């Protein structure tokens, strides 16, 4: 979740240009609806508030699909053991006041007293994290767009499908827990948050993965580490504000994200082992397009730039920053030993050089941007009852 440089159009490694993330222009569907409305023959159909008009589909060469079929036994041995049995997993209720307890109201009162000490800008970051987690239907859908690894039936016994469903089930607890905690604090406008979640799921996401599992697993590797960092930082902040229970909540979620990061980075590590040239080209492609955050189409019905504003607050508080983005890239380059790859094609060597030298360039650009930065404006956030928060 959180801050990432804005997406810009760039050619992919398979030779097809990538488009922008969103458009405020009128789509053909909307234009047709407007014509219909003028003659009063029908209502305007639903359209998502954020639409992506230029998308690339099915860039994976057919012969590459066989790789993922052959990796089924490997995936069973190396991925499924990273999942926790349900009976041994934590559940949201483990961290919340027990509604059947005589002390329930006292526990809620204590929770609300602790929450009073937490500033609005922190809640903006926490809500943004929670909204991102709550859009889980979109992320399962995204994984099931990937050729060669999707769940073909909804209950497929293939290892890839079992992993995706179980991963989704584990992730589902994150949004549930943060949502219930937020509700009990009384500090945030739950209806505005709920609207934001509905808008976001309706808009979907555009990660630029092109139905291609190479791109998809590179994306999830980056994202799981990003969410691990973000939740870890919100845990640290909560502890500083004196809310040890909230710190425990965020830290527990961060630990899940770290385990999921391990799984996805293992997949990409295996792809580098068996198909290094195509994998490094895919890595460079994703980094040229820039890793968009899962909630980049966020909207609350009011703020057309809600994601950018939320990201700016997260950057200022140190919850998730441009430096984190560069650090994640550097971590993955080292984790996958990209600099040590040999036997690459000419295009592969250029891709290798690009990803291995990108992190320092991102840091330099960020340092220049910070040096030029002016006093950030203060704007209202609907999530905290339109109270103003500095970006």
From Swiss-Prot:
Cofactor binding note: Binds 2 Fe(2+) ions per subunit.
Protein's GO biological process: fatty acid biosynthetic process
Matches recorded under InterPro entries: FADS-2_CS, Fatty_acid_desaturase-2, Ferritin-like_SF, RNR-like
Pathway of action: Lipid metabolism; fatty acid metabolism
Keyword annotations: Chloroplast, Fatty acid biosynthesis, Fatty acid metabolism, Iron, Lipid biosynthesis, Lipid metabolism, Metal-binding, Oxidoreductase, Plastid, Transit peptide
Family that this chain belongs to: Belongs to the fatty acid desaturase type 2 family.
Protein name per its UniProtKB record: Stearoyl-[acyl-carrier-protein] 9-desaturase 5, chloroplastic
Organism listed in the record: Oryza sativa subsp. indica
């Amino acid at each position: 979740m959180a801050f990432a440089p804005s997406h810009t159009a760039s050619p992919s490694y398979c030779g097809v240009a990538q488009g922008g993330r969103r458009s405020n222009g009128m789509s053909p569907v909307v234009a047709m609806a407007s014509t219909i409305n003028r003659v009063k023959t029908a209502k305007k159909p639903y359209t998502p508030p954020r639409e992506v008009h230029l998308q690339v589909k099915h860039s994976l060469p057919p012969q590459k699909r066989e790789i993922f079929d052959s990796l089924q036994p490997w995936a069973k041995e190396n991925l499924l053991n990273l999942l926790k049995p349900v009976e041994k997993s934590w559940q949201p209720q483990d961290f919340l006041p027990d509604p059947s307890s005589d002390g329930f109201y006292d526990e809620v009162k204590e929770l609300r007293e602790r929450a009073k000490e937490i500033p609005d800008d922190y809640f903006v970051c926490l809500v943004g994290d929670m909204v991102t987690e709550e859009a889980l239907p979109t992320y399962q859908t995204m994984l099931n767009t990937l050729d060669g690894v999707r769940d073909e039936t909804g209950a497929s016994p293939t290892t890839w499908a079992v992993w995706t469903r179980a991963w989704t089930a584990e992730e589902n607890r994150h949004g549930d827990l943060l949502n219930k905690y937020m509700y009990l604090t009384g500090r945030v406008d739950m209806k505005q948050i709920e609207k934001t979640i509905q808008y976001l799921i309706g808009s979907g996401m555009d990660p630029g993965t092109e139905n291609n599992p190479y791109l998809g697993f590179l994306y999830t590797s980056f994202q799981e580490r990003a969410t691990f960092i973000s939740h870890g930082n919100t845990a640290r902040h909560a502890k500083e504000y004196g809310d040890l229970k909230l710190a425990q909540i965020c830290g527990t979620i961060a630990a899940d994200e770290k385990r999921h990061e391990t799984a996805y980075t293992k997949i990409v590590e295996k792809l580098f082992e068996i198909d290094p040239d195509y994998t490094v080209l895919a890595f460079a492609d994703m980094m040229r397009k820039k890793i968009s955050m899962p909630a980049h189409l966020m909207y609350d019905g009011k703020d057309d730039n809600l994601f950018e504003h939320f990201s700016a607050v997260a950057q200022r508080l140190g919850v998730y920053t441009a430096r984190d983005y560069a650090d994640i890239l550097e971590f993955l380059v080292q984790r996958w030993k990209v600099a040590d790859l040999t036997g690459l094609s000419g295009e592969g060597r250029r891709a290798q050089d690009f990803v291995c030298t990108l992190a320092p360039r991102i840091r330099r650009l960020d340092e220049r941007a910070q040096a030029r930065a002016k006093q950030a404006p203060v704007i209202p956030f609907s999530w905290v009852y339109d109270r103003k928060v500095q970006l």
